[in-house]
Design a protein with these regions (language model features):
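Metal-dependent enolase-superfamily TIM-barrel catalytic cores that perform enediolate-based chemistry
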Residues: 116-237, 242
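Ligand-binding pocket scaffold of soluble enzyme catalytic domains
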Residues: 21, 27, 32, 100, ...
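Metal- or metallocofactor-binding catalytic centers and their adjacent structured scaffolds
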Residues: 24-103
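Shared catalytic-loop signature of beta/alpha-barrel
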Residues: 46-51, 65, 214, 220-223, ...
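Conserved, mostly hydrophobic/aromatic
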Residues: 3, 28, 51, 89, ...
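Structured beta-strand/loop patches that form or line metal/cofactor-binding pockets in enzymes
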Residues: 1-32, 36, 334-336
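N-terminal amphipathic alpha-helix/helix-capping segment at the start of soluble metabolic enzymes
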Residues: 1-14, 99, 103-116, 350
């Protein structure tokens, strides 16, 4: 089995941009991949075309060697555009390997340590009341977690407050106050057994994160996500000295080296690995195993489509250190025209079927 071509499919559908790829082989098998930064589509496509020339004629089973060729081949370390291109190709190579031996990806990764993976949706709202209503609806649908963004990060603001501010602007003091009010109301609405996740989306500084965590501590959130900007992972060292709530971070980091400090110094509790940015299955599995040695669970970042979802759930099914899996759209209800065969979902859990590779078509 040799690689013959890589096809690119930039798409805009259902209000978002996506970039899927197919790695074609001389025996007719095709592997699917997905790019993590589709909004940078033209740049990523150029990177994929550049990498394609290095991969023609290569054996997909030699994925570790091919990963090293892609990552090291330009001398300079790849940024997020190249790492996203590498990620999509690497995921497609693993999909091909599974298809070539008629085995699901999670079995190639060591076999299942769980038969399903607990997931969380995105529960948004243009007002706090809408957020509360959507959270209650998610629980009624079977979800065991609810997640929303720091006020104004995803447009979740009181209507009266929104009219007084510039659209898209986040005032930290007011945002922290609103986030506290929202968490109190959501906790009251969904009960004590549902996990609450607040995504700060890297929009606060250390002092305001400490204030936020002090205020919401009584509501026992499952974690606070990406509270600080990602350029300086060492900033989590100072935060960890003052915050007792679990912290999740890492969705913007594009290699295992960017995770090094927060894992080695135990600065986070959950590693938000993005398989479609960090380097694909090959790199994500290494980070997962590394995190396990520090008793850090993974919470794979998955804001994308069916390919990303299948790759994430495959990794989680084959890994012991898993917290929860992001799943913004319930599998089987999203992009069915593109992928009529997808992973399964029921009552807040997702799992891969015993179809070869990623298990989607």
């Amino acid at each position: 089995m040799k690689i013959t071509e890589i096809k690119k499919y930039p798409l805009a559908y259902e209000g978002r941009e996506s970039l899927f790829i197919e790695v074609l082989t001389d025996n007719g098998l095709k592997g699917l991949g997905e790019v993590g930064v589709a909004k940078m589509g033209n740049a990523v496509i150029a990177a994929i075309e550049h990498l394609e020339q290095r991969l023609i004629g290569e054996d997909p089973w030699e994925s570790e060697k091919l990963w090293q060729i892609m990552f090291r081949g330009n001398f300079f370390p790849p940024g997020v555009i190249y790492s996203s291109a590498i990620s999509a190709i690497d995921i497609a190579l693993w999909d091909l390997k599974g298809k070539s031996v008629n085995l699901p990806l999670y079995k190639l990764l060591g076999g299942p340590v769980r038969n399903k993976v607990v997931c969380y949706p995105h529960t948004q709202g243009s007002t706090t009341q809408e957020l509360v209503d959507n959270s209650k609806r998610a629980v009624e649908e079977g979800w065991k977690f609810v997640r929303w963004g720091q006020p104004e990060t995803h447009g979740v603001l009181e209507e009266a407050e929104l009219s007084e501010q510039m659209p898209g602007k986040l005032e930290p003091i007011e945002s922290v106050r609103l986030a506290t009010e929202q968490m109190a109301l959501v906790r009251e609405a969904v009960g004590d057994e549902i996990g609450l996740l607040l995504d700060v989306h890297t929009r606060l500084d250390t002092a305001h994160v400490i204030d936020l965590c002090d205020r919401v501590k009584e509501f026992k959130p499952f974690f606070i996500e990406d509270p600080l900007r990602s350029e300086s992972p060492h900033a989590y060292r100072n935060l960890s000295k003052h915050v007792s709530l679990p912290i999740a971070a890492g969705e913007q980091w594009s290699s295992k080296w960017q995770f090094r400090q927060v894992i080695e110094e135990d600065l986070i509790n959950y590693a938000r690995i993005d398989l479609c940015i960090v380097g694909g299955i090959t790199e994500a599995k290494k980070i997962t195993n590394w995190a396990e040695t520090h008793y850090i669970d993974i919470v794979p970042h998955n804001p994308l489509g069916a390919v990303s979802a299948a790759a994430c759930v495959s990794l989680c099914m084959a890994s012991t250190n898993v917290g929860v899996q992001e799943m913004p759209r319930r599998p089987g209800t999203d992009s069915n025209d593109l992928f009529p065969v997808q992973i399964s979902w029921e009552d807040g859990y997702a799992w891969c079927n015993d179809l070869p590779g990623l298990g989607i078509e």
